[in-house]
Every structure is written in C-alpha cells, then in structure tokens.
C-alpha cells in the first residue's frame, strides 16, 4: 500500500458475527464489497465510448505495468488489477493512528488475518474522525489520513482480486507503477502483526521495481517527472527521519525518565519547531505543482503521524541490500524474505535481516512498535 492492508478481509469478517465490535467489522466487509460491486473489467472500460481518452490511456498503462510486474518482478499473476472501480471519493479508506504524548509507539488494534497493527481503517471519513476523537479523549495524539489503495493479500482473488481504483489511477507513471508493485508484493508474503517488516519489504519492492520500470519502459518525460516527484519525497523523508530520531531522544531523555514533563514538553516543542522551520526551507527550494504536497502533513504532524511513517521506511535499506546480495534475482530474494519472515519473533526477524545484509539498522521508531499507516 503504498498503503497497508487497511481493512480486514471481507471474507473473514463475515464470519465474525459473535464479535463485540461487529459494527466495525461489518463496515469493513460491506465497504470492501461495495468496491467490488462497482468494479468492471478493464476491457469493458476501454470499449466504452463514454470513457475519456486520458482514463483509457491510464488503464492501458496499468495493464502494461501489471504485465511487467509478473514478467520482470516475479509478482503474482492473478485477477488483481485487471478491473477498475470509480469510487467517486478521494480515498479508498481513511486510517486512524494514535500515539501517547511522549512516545512514537502507536496504539495497536487487532484483526483477523492482519494481526495486531498500528492503525484502524474506515471506509467512511466521518467514522474515522469519530474514532480519532474517541482516542483523543483518552489522551492520545491522533491523525486521520486518506489511503489510496490497500491489499487483500490475495484472499479475494476468487472474487476478482484487488481492482485498480480512481483514487490512484491518475498518479504519475512512475508512482502508478510503484503502487501496483507494492500492493502485489503484499500478496507474496505477509507476516501478521509485523507491519514494519511488511511495509518495509513492500516499499523496497516498489522502489526497486519502480526504478526498473522507469529505466526500461518509461519515456524520458515520465522519468523526468518522476525524478522531480521522488526527489522531493526523499528530501522530506530524510527530514522526517531526523525528526523521529530527535523526538525519540526527547522521550528517552533523563528529563523524561525523571518525570519532568515541563522540560520534556519544551524539548518536544523545540524539535517540532525545528522540523517545521526546516520544511519551510525545503519547500522554498521546490518548484512545480507539488511544491505544497506535504503542507497538510506538516501542519498536523504529531507523534501519531511520525510513528505511522516509520513503518514504511525503517527496514527498507536492509531489504534493498538483501536484494543486491541475492544478485538482484527476484525469486531468490522472495525465498530469502520468506525464510526470514518465518522466524517467530520481530526481534529475530530484524536480527536475521541485519545478519543477512551486514547492515546495522538504525531507525527512530523502535521496529517492534507495530507502527502502521501510509507513509508520506
């Protein structure tokens, strides 16, 4: 995913009639099924004279990307991304994340199949905001953010798979390729309850695969457009990583251990002020329509947003190094990732990844925190 699998799987949820939280599971099941109901095979959209030429071009591009994913990245060849759904809304789901005032550790929610993760997804934005408000009332910092895509991990291929969605079909070529590669990567493997491992792995697949697509298949214009887009993203992620580290230092400081919360609040404010000042400097250097792409994220930044972002970044260098170690051979890479994924604990998986790649993973958000969400 480019987003995590933000809803529990519809097929499983329909079996949960005895759960205390039946209302939530029902909205998850009915929300996903509502997407499947409006999805139509891509050829039907292409044959419809009422469909605009730009949308047809994007759908054709998405089919090329899907074929590339299967042929060049050894990703699953199934029903996913062979249909398209126009949702008439800006997001597939809205994720809620929450964290304490002095920690980047996200609150966990537990679901069938997905395990315990640091987010809760809603198909209705108002419901997501209500959940965030409920968590705020408990003293947590919260965030609600739109998710353009999620994966059903291959469980819904019998029902047509995961469709292309209007929420991301208009993305620039390189980004469209990355989101398809990311979501298909989740169908290769998924470790219940370890969102940092899952999202870092899928992000590594999308980055490596996206670079391959751009080099081999994209036009010079598409490569140039993507270079500008990704350059800004990498600068922002680097700044956010430094800020996560700074915040963790604050929350692990002597003042925090002594319970001097006035001092901790002052240090936290200083770290956030520095983040926003440095972002303003970065933004002033950027050009083009995406100059203000992160403005809202920065304005709302808190422990929850920083904690969520860590899931997509923290272990990526290890997976990229593992791919290089396996001679850039996708089947060998997936086999080794499966071996590591089969280890029983998060700590063992992190240690195995470090040993396999010779890298010491240094990150700001304590990988065992089950962080989740859609990275910036």
Predicted features, each with a name:
Residues 1-8:
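Bacterial N-terminal signal peptides that target proteins for export
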Residues 15-18:
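C-terminal motif of bacterial Sec signal peptides marking the signal peptidase cleavage site
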Residues 20-23:
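Bacterial signal peptide processing site
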Residues 29-69:
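Amphipathic alpha-helical packing elements
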Residues 35, 48, 55-62, 121-128, ...:
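Solvent-exposed, acidic/flexible segments
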Residues 36-53, 109-117, 299-301, 317:
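Acidic/histidine-rich, surface-exposed loop or edge segments in extracytoplasmic proteins
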Residues 65-233, 248:
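Acidic/His-rich structured neighborhood in mature extracellular/periplasmic domains
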Residues 241-365, 372-376:
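Pan-zinc metallopeptidase signature
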């Amino acid at each position: 995913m480019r987003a995590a699998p933000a809803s529990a799987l519809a097929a499983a949820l329909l079996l949960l009639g005895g759960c205390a939280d039946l209302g939530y599971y029902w909205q998850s099941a009915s929300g996903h099924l509502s997407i499947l109901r409006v999805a139509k095979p891509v050829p039907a959209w292409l044959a419809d004279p009422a469909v605009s030429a730009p949308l047809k071009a994007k759908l054709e591009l998405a089919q090329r990307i899907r074929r590339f994913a299967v042929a060049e990245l050894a990703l699953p060849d199934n029903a996913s991304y062979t249909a398209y759904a126009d949702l008439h809304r800006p997001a597939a789901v809205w994720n809620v994340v929450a964290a304490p005032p002095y920690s980047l550790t996200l609150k966990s929610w537990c679901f069938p199949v997905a395990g315990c993760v640091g987010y809760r997804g809603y198909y209705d934005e108002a419901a997501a905001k209500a959940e965030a408000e409920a968590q705020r009332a408990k003293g947590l910092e919260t965030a609600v953010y739109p998710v353009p895509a999620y994966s059903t991990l291959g469980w819904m291929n019998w029902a047509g798979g995961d469709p292309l969605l209007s929420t991301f079909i208009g993305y620039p070529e390189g980004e469209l390729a990355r989101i398809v590669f990311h979501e298909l990567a989740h169908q290769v493997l998924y470790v219940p309850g370890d969102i940092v491992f899952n999202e870092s792995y899928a992000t590594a697949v999308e980055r490596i695969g996206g670079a391959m697509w751009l080099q081999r298949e994209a036009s010079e214009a598409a490569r140039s457009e993507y270079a500008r887009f990704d350059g800004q993203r990498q600068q922002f992620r680097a700044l956010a990583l430094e800020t996560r580290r700074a915040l963790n230092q604050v929350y692990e400081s002597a003042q925090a251990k002594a319970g001097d919360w006035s001092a901790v609040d002052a240090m936290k404010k200083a770290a956030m002020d520095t983040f926003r000042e440095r972002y303003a400097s970065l933004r002033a250097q950027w050009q083009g329509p995406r100059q203000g792409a992160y403005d809202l994220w920065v304005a709302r930044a808190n422990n929850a947003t920083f904690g969520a972002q860590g899931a997509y970044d923290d272990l990526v260098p290890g997976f990229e190094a593992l791919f290089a170690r396996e001679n850039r051979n996708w089947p060998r890479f997936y086999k080794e990732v499966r071996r590591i994924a089969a280890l029983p604990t998060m700590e063992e998986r992190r240690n195995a990844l470090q040993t396999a790649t010779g890298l010491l993973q240094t990150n700001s958000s304590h990988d065992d925190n089950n962080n989740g969400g859609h990275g910036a």
